[in-house]
Regions:
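Glycine-rich, proline-tolerant flexible connector loops at the mouths of alpha/beta enzymes
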Residues: 34-58, 70, 102-104, 176-180, ...
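Hydrophobic faces of well-ordered beta-strands that scaffold small-molecule active sites
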Residues: 5-9, 33-35, 63-67, 94-98, ...
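Conserved, mostly hydrophobic/aromatic
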Residues: 25, 29, 55, 86, ...
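Active-site mouth loops of central-metabolism enzymes
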Residues: 3-16, 67-77, 146-157, 212-215, ...
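An alpha-helical appendage that flanks or caps ligand/catalytic pockets
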Residues: 111-143, 183-184, 188-305
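N-terminal beta1-alpha1-beta2 module of alpha/beta enzyme domains
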Residues: 1-59, 63-66, 150
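Short, acidic/polar
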Residues: 14-25, 82, 156-164, 292-302
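Alpha-helix-loop-beta-strand connector modules within alpha/beta enzyme cores
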Residues: 46-69, 128, 192-196, 327-337
């Protein structure tokens, strides 16, 4: 099965540098490029839409979007305005991946969005993009011209969010690791939501978030990627996921230190590796795509068999471009698919 491939690129350096990098990513054959949206994370990240706009000006075909935005750190109407503008700059290549903001709302002292907030945001964006008369809360507008083809893609991990995505979104971004058993578990919930709304398969695209490392030194890859599993093991759904992967749930240590600003975005990755040393190798291997180019290609092929449409690839990093993963995918993985 042929699927699409995207790359996660963080906002490091100036927007002009990101634009040049996006041009390289496009030339390498990637279908989409999404950039995270956590404003001023650790004082180092910048505004995602500035970077995306510059990327749009230097590319011609690759689709662009925040990966992912949320209705908390930006008001939904502000997100809608930014995405419409990006769609105009890129001549129809904008996408709207969004989630609850669990990894970004905390920096402002707020909680992640509720399911009701995500439903309301989706309805607002769909109304705005369609050009329908839309009440923004204090003023009614009709978008001129409308942009009805911007896809609204909901990021989801838990059962209720996966079901909501299947019910109302144009696509679902599945964030449950890289084991086919976990993906099938997630898709069962997506399909429950689709059935509830009377939707068919073609109405909801399926994209996987896959954290990956292409390295012939398998143990080195495991050690590098170990922190990427840490947050998942503290999630309420860990028992179900690891059961689907045929693994036992490891015992969490008490009072584990938290790297700055958080485990998934640690400025000091060596510290992140130290505080997650308790995670067994087999869990790291199950939840990431890692190893040689052949091993990563075999994992990608197994995931494609789960009836998905795309993989959004990301590395472990936060503070630099994903150069090693980029080259590893292009040179060693994609030729084997």
């Amino acid at each position: 099965m042929t699927i699409e491939h995207g790359l996660r690129v963080p906002m490091v350096g100036k927007p002009q540098a990101t634009a040049a990098y996006a041009k390289e990513v496009e030339a390498a054959g990637f279908d989409f490029l999404w950039m995270p949206d956590t404003p001023l994370l650790a004082g180092l990240w910048r505004d995602v839409y500035m970077h995306l706009t510059c990327a749009a000006l230097e590319t011609k075909h690759i689709r662009l979007g925040p990966g992912v935005t949320n209705p908390i750190t930006r008001l939904p109407v502000t997100v809608g305005s930014a995405i419409v503008t990006l769609n105009e700059v890129s001549e129809g290549r904008a996408e709207l991946p969004y989630g609850s903001g669990y990894s970004s709302a905390y920096i402002t002292g707020r909680k992640a969005a509720s399911l009701q907030m995500m439903r309301e945001a989706t309805e607002l964006w769909r109304s705005i993009f369609s050009g329908a008369l839309t009440d923004l809360g204090g003023l009614e507008i009709e978008l001129d011209p409308p942009h009805p083809d911007i896809p609204i893609i909901m990021a989801a991990s838990g059962p209720r969010t996966l079901q909501l995505a299947g019910e109302i979104a144009d696509g679902v971004l599945i964030m449950v690791g890289a084991h086919p058993g976990c993906i099938q578990w997630a898709l069962e919930h997506v399909e429950t939501g689709m059935a509830r709304a009377g939707r068919d398969r073609a109405e909801v695209s399926r994209t996987l978030v896959i954290t990956a490392c292409v390295d012939d030194d398998r143990q080195r890859a495991i050690d590098l990627m170990r922190p990427c599993v840490g947050n998942l093991l503290r999630h309420s759904l860990v028992n179900e996921l690891l059961d689907r992967a045929g693994l036992a749930v490891p015992k969490l240590p008490d009072n584990t230190p938290q790297p700055y600003p958080d485990l998934g975005h640690a400025v000091d990755w060596e510290e992140a590796k130290r505080v997650t040393a308790w995670i067994p190798d087999e869990v790291v291997v199950a939840m990431n795509a890692l190893g040689s180019g052949l091993e990563v290609a075999e994992r990608a092929a197994a995931l494609a068999e789960c009836d998905i449409d795309a993989i959004w690839w990301r590395d472990h990093g936060t503070w630099e471009y994903p150069n090693a993963l980029f080259r590893g995918l292009v040179d060693e993985v994609f030729p084997k698919l």
